Curated annotation (Swiss-Prot):
InterPro entries, per the entry: FabA_FabZ (IPR013114), FabZ (IPR010084), HotDog_dom_sf (IPR029069)
Reactions catalysed: a (3R)-hydroxyacyl-[ACP] = a (2E)-enoyl-[ACP] + H2O
UniProt cross-references to NCBIfam families, sorted A to Z: fabZ (TIGR01750), PRK00006.1 (NF000582)
Active site annotation, chain numbering: 48
EC number(s) from the headed UniProt entry: 4.2.1.59
Main localization of the protein described in the UniProt heading: cytoplasm
Gene name for this UniProt entry: fabZ
UniProt name for this protein: 3-hydroxyacyl-[acyl-carrier-protein] dehydratase FabZ
GO BP annotations, alphabetical order: fatty acid biosynthetic process; lipid A biosynthetic process
Database matches in Pfam families: FabA (PF07977)
GO molecular function, one term: (3R)-hydroxyacyl-[acyl-carrier-protein] dehydratase activity
Disulfide linkage: none
Family: Belongs to the thioester dehydratase family. FabZ subfamily.
């Protein structure tokens, strides 16, 4: 398990763009499972949407990417480096995510060649799929 300080030692993201609160489990180069507690205090809800707050899908995708980056950047050969989005395929949004929800995100790495990684990501709320996607990472 990794807390926010340990996550910040791996990822370059900081408030307001560090979107995962805790890593529940991970195996370097294999998978990571993270949690994001969605709070009404997040600035995005001032405009998306007043009176009907909904977490934007791009924030869910970014939280997925950060989760996958933990699985990649904990490999010895990538420690201290940065993982960038290389692409998103087949993103599907299946459930609205609102303040008070807890996203559980799992990213399983399926391919890793040189500095390119591909992973399958799923985000759930209370066991219900909120988003699925295939993510490509580029390590710099």
């Amino acid at each position: 398990m990794l807390d926010s300080q340990e996550i910040q030692a791996i990822l370059p993201h900081r408030y307001p763009m560090l979107l995962i609160d805790r890593v529940l489990s991970f195996e370097p180069g294999e998978f990571a499972i993270a949690r994001k507690n969605v709070s009404i205090n997040e600035a995005v809800f001032q405009g998306h949407f007043p009176g009907n707050p909904v977490l934007p899908g791009v924030f869910i995708l970014e939280a997925m990417a950060q989760t996958g980056a933990v699985a990649l950047l904990t490999l010895d050969q990538f420690k201290g480096r940065t993982a960038f989005f290389g692409g998103v395929k087949s993103a599907k949004f299946r459930r609205v995510v609102r303040p008070g929800d807890t996203l559980e995100i799992k990213v399983t790495l399926e391919k890793l060649k040189d500095r390119i990684g591909v992973g399958k990501a799923i985000a759930t709320v209370d066991g219900e799929k909120a988003c699925t996607a295939e993510l490509t990472f580029i390590i710099e």
